[in-house]
């Protein structure tokens, strides 16, 4: 029996090529794993109305980890138009399977190394060596949106006097995306960034935020960052 069970999710397009290359590397290392095929991506949205079928979620819950390639993601109207004809009157709405996975399994930290290697003619600068920590599940990734804007939501938002100006525009002409941030979410990603810096000998941690404009959400993140 293999030491690890890994959900294998090529997804769409270049994802298949990326996963083929990954398998070559894993096999060359004699990595002891069983790879379980799992469906995800545009094909399953078009055919089934769900880019992340429940059977895939069940596989993910029963494996040690997952390897994922890439997915296609399109705007709402295009996504609807590409559904199978028998699904187009079912009221289905496309939601990114990657965002859904992040929220479902609390995969809130996206870690992106960025390093320049000597001899690469495409280097912007030869001394670049940084790691980006990006929040995956909160902020705009919460996915809480409205269009048109419901009267009940507008009334609640009128606790903030800046909201009243949008009434004159006509609520049927207003789209709203919410930036939801929690104390716990901010603390988690800040702690991970500082822990990484300490563990890997990094000399500084920099926060990218806009608290002078996004005073509540940006301000919350900035205060927590400084406290950590």
List each model region and its residues:
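A short beta-strand-loop structural module common to alpha/beta enzyme folds
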Residues: 32-44
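N-terminal glycine-rich phosphate/adenylate-binding segment common to multiple enzyme folds
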Residues: 46-163, 175-176
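Generic secondary-structure signature for well-ordered alpha-helical cores
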Residues: 27, 31, 62-65, 103-110, ...
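Short, active-site-adjacent cap segments at secondary-structure transitions
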Residues: 43, 74-75, 213-215
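Short, flexible loop segments at the rims of nucleotide/cofactor-binding pockets, characterized by
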Residues: 43-47, 182-183
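Glycine-rich phosphate/diphosphate-binding loop of Rossmann-like nucleotide-binding domains
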Residues: 6-29, 155-228
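Basic/polar N-terminal segments that are highly enriched at the extreme N-terminus
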Residues: 1-3
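Short, ordered loop/turn segments at secondary-structure junctions
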Residues: 11-13, 40, 71, 116, ...
């Amino acid at each position: 029996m293999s030491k690890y069970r890994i959900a294998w999710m090529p997804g769409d397009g270049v994802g298949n090529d990326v996963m083929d290359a990954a398998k070559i590397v894993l096999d060359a290392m004699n990595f002891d794993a069983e790879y379980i095929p799992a469906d995800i991506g545009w094909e399953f949205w078009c055919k089934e109305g769900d880019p992340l079928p429940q059977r895939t979620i069940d596989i993910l819950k029963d494996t040690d980890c997952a390897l994922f390639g890439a997915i296609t993601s399109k705007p709402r109207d295009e996504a609807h138009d590409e559904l199978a004809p028998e699904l187009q009157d079912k009221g289905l709405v496309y939601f990114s399977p990657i965002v859904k996975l992040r929220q479902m399994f609390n995969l809130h930290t996206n870690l992106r190394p960025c390093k320049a290697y000597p001899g690469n003619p495409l280097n912007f600068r030869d001394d670049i060596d940084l790691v980006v920590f990006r929040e995956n599940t909160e902020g705009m990734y919460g996915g809480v949106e409205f269009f048109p804007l419901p009267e009940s939501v507008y009334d609640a938002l009128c606790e903030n006097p800046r909201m009243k100006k949008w009434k004159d525009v006509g609520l049927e002409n207003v789209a709203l995306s919410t930036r939801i941030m929690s104390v716990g979410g901010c603390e988690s990603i800040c702690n991970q960034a500082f822990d990484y810096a300490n563990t890997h000998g990094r000399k500084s941690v920099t926060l990218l935020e806009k608290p002078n404009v996004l005073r509540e959400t940006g301000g919350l993140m900035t205060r927590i960052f400084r406290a950590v």
